Every structure is written in C-alpha cells, then in structure tokens.
A protein has these predicted regions:
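Conserved acidic donor-binding segment of nucleotide-sugar-dependent glycosyltransferases
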Residues: 358-359, 363-370, 379-385
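Short hydrophobic beta-strand element within catalytic cores of glycosyltransferases
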Residues: 343-346, 356
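A short, active-site helix/loop in glycosyltransferases that binds the activated sugar's phosphate group
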Residues: 141-146, 166-214, 219-223, 229
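Aromatic "clamp/platform" in nucleotide-sugar-dependent glycosyltransferases that forms part
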Residues: 326
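Nucleotide-activated donor-binding/catalytic signature segment of Leloir-type glycosyltransferases, i.e.
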Residues: 274, 278, 285-312, 317
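Conserved donor-binding/catalytic core segment of Leloir-type glycosyltransferases
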Residues: 239-258, 264-267
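A short, well-ordered alpha-helix in the C-terminal region of glycosyltransferases
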Residues: 2, 372-375, 379, 386-401, ...
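Short glycine/serine-rich donor-binding loops of glycosyltransferases
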Residues: 331-334, 352
C-alpha cells in the first residue's frame, strides 16, 4: 500500500510542516509514504518537488503565483486574509501517475499547486481513494481559508465578504461552482484536524455527503518538551523575576483572525491589577512595530522564530501562553506550548476546544470577552501551586492525544480500511467477469 501526500510545500508554514511531520511519522510507523510538493524546502529524498534553486524553477514559481492571484486584482475592497481561486495550470496528474500511489492524501494545496478538476484526474486511470486532511476551511468554500461569520459555504458562495464583493456571481461563486462540478460523485474521505472543522465540513454543501473522520494534528513531543525555565529565559535574555505572558503566530499583530485586539484589551484590564508590575508580555512572529501598539505592560518582541528548538525555548520560558484567536482549525501553537508544560488561556471557540480543558490544563474564556480573557490570565498566574498543576496537566494532555504515534496509527487504520475496501471491490469485479 503506497501513500502519496500532496502539499504545496514541505516546510515554511504551519500547514506545510504539519503535512511533512505526518509523512515522516507514517514512515516511522512502517507506511510506504511519499510526498509531492510544489516548493521543496527540505533535503528529504522521500519528498519530490522543486527546490527553487535554478532560474527556470524560480520563473515557473513566479508565473504560478501571478496566475493564481491575478483575478483578485479587480477586487479593490478585498480583505487582508488569503483567498485562493486555484486556477493555475500544472502537471501534477502526470507526476502522480509516475509515482502510482494506492491512496492520495491531500493537505494544504492552495497557492497555485492544484485546481479542483485535478482531483478527478487522479482517479481516471485506476481507482485511488482520496483522503483530505483539512487544515482550514478552503476545501469547502469559494476561496477563503476562514469564513469568519459568513456561512454561505453551506449553500453556495457569492457576494463574498472576503472579496468585499456585492456581486453574487463573483469569483467566490465561480470557484465554488468549479469545485462542485469537479467533485461530484468523487470518492473522498475528509479528515479534519478538529471537531469544529468537522462540523463545518458536515454543514457545507460540498462535503455534507462525504465520510468525515476527525484525526487531530500532532507534534514532536521530543522537540517540544519542558526546558528548565531559568535556562530558557537566560537563552532569550528574558527577566527571571517576572511572570511572562506569551503570544505569537505568523503575523500575530496583523492577522485579525489571531485576535490581537482582544489580547490588547485583556492586557489593559490586567494592567490595572495591583500585581501588574510582576507581568511582562513576550511576542514572537513579528518584530517590534514602528508605531506603538499600546499593550499597557512591558513587552519584548522576539521576532520570527523559524525552528522548533527556539520555539520550545520560548514556550518553556513563559508562564502562560495566550491564544486569543477568533477562528483556528486546530490551534497548533496552543499544543506546542502545552507540550512544553505551559498552560494556555484562549477563548472557548473553534478548534481550540479540543485541547483546552477549562481550569484543568488552562483556561477557556467566554468567547471574545476580553475581561474574561484577562481574568483567565490572572487566574493561571496568581497561584504557584495551581500553575504547577496546570503545567503538568498540559503536558499530559499532549502526551495522551496529540503525539505522532497517535496520529500515525489513526491514519494507518483509515488507509487500511480504504485500501482493503478498494481491493475487495476490484476482486469482486474481476471474479464477476470470469
């Protein structure tokens, strides 16, 4: 049984890294796993893709991205989030045929890597079951990766708020229609990272009739492990005598979905507390902005942390991690922090609900209530004995649910079911012809 993972990249971003780690975990578990990407950043021989080193490869990548995002230029009121129309041509189907997998596992395939019609091509020469690891909402929307308050994907997209469009027959409508046409009667199993994302998929018009099975994301608990707090703080030149409040993501202050404004309001509440002089805020994922962002507490910016070791050091240095996101498919930073024995304070919403157990391994605040978010931070930090218990429970949660071995075994079981079902169908068809 040969499995092929399709992902836009094998590193350089949370979705890409998650796909690559899953591929490596399956190899470790004895699965004949391969990976095909548009942009290859690792030197792994089990990954096929362009390294972007040669001039022609750079030109192809530039053309792909230009074609992919050209239609968006007409939408002058488009919001800042990613929108992927998936129109750039490619030769992925030819490469898939050369590898000849039994099962194809799709991951994050936007950015001009695949078009909706390509999925049907994978099953033209022989039956191959498709599994789609949902890492955001794009597979069942008209192009946005997170829908916010919009629920148009439950019927059909159009008049897209992400595009700032009032035209029903806009790019989101056309993209959604292309998906519906291409995926009609397609044999595919949907594997969302969280129960919230699974519920969204079940409610969507595109996937409501597909098999949906939640398989959580996973991390390397050997890399993301508790490090002595004093040592971690020394390595990052952080104060030893402060309660450190950590916040971070890709573009944490610019991406509205990450909830920075809620954090800012919560910290303003916290700054009025008598013990606020004990607190300091640490932010990773961005440099210190040119303009003051008024966090009301002393703040250190660590910049972009691009390796697991430095991230683990940052998590271990903190007393609490705050994840004030509005929507998260899973919330990988929360799991990474918990694996380093750092409790998490977040809103009780979307994918974060699968990992944070209120007042057991962190604090689940009322949705988008900055006052309760502030209360949660204070509650975690104000009692040393409680903080120690929360930290232990945080690590235990990850070890019991979110390890590579847990993830690999669930996917192995799913692949085996699908492969055996296909094999029995083929055997039946062959015997019927005899």
């Amino acid at each position: 049984m040969k499995v092929l993972h399709l992902s836009t990249a094998d590193a350089n971003g949370g979705a890409a890294r998650g796909a690559y780690w899953m591929h490596k975990a399956l190899l470790q578990a004895g699965v004949d796993s391969h990976m095909l990407v548009a942009d290859k950043f690792t030197s792994d021989p089990t990954v096929t893709g362009s390294t972007g080193i040669t001039g022609s490869q750079k030109i192809r990548k530039g053309l792909r991205q230009t074609l992919e995002y050209w239609p968006l230029k007409r939408y002058k009121n488009k919001k800042s989030g990613v929108f992927s129309p998936a129109i750039a041509p490619n030769n992925i189907a030819v490469q898939v045929e050369a590898i000849d997998p039994d099962i194809i596992n799709l991951h994050w395939i936007a950015g001009g890597f695949l078009r909706p019609q390509d999925l049907r091509k994978f099953q033209e020469t022989r039956h191959r079951h498709l599994v789609w690891t949902l890492r955001d909402m794009w597979p069942f929307t008209g192009g946005c990766h997170y829908s916010g308050t919009c629920a148009a994907y439950q019927t059909s997209c159009g008049s897209c708020p992400a595009l700032g469009s009032s035209n029903f027959y806009d790019l989101s409508y056309k993209t959604w229609q292309r998906k519906q046409s291409a995926w009609k009667n397609l044999d595919i199993t949907i594997a969302p990272l969280s129960n919230w994302l699974a519920d969204c998929a079940r409610q969507s018009a595109l996937f409501s009739h597909q098999r949906i099975q939640v398989i959580p994301n996973a991390i390397d608990t050997n890399k993301y492990r508790p490090i002595d707090k004093a040592t971690a703080r020394n390595l990052l030149n952080l104060p030893q005598n402060k309660k450190l409040i950590l916040f971070g993501a890709l573009s944490p202050t610019a991406d509205s979905r990450k909830g920075f404004t809620h954090l800012r309001d919560a910290l303003q509440h916290l700054s009025s507390q008598p013990v606020s002089s004990d607190y300091e805020v640490i932010i990773f994922g961005t440099d210190k902005p040119a303009q003051n962002i008024a966090l009301h507490l002393p703040t250190t910016f660590l910049g972009y942390l691009n390796d697991d070791i430095t991230l683990a050091i940052a998590y271990s240095a903190a007393d609490v991690m705050v994840v004030p996101s509005i929507q998260e498919a899973f919330g990988k930073t929360s799991i990474e922090a918990m694996s380093c024995a750092t409790p998490v304070v977040a809103f009780k919403t979307t994918g974060l609900q699968d990992s944070i157990v209120h007042q057991h391994n962190g604090y689940a605040a009322k949705c988008f209530d900055a006052t309760d978010l502030s209360a949660g931070i204070k509650w975690v930090l104000e009692d040393e004995s409680r903080l120690q218990t929360l930290s232990e429970h945080a690590r235990q949660t990850v070890e019991s649910k979110f390890t590579f071995s847990h993830q690999a075994e669930q996917y192995k079981s799913l692949y085996r079911q699908l492969f055996e079902a296909v094999s029995s169908d083929v055997s039946y068809s062959t015997s019927s012809l005899a």
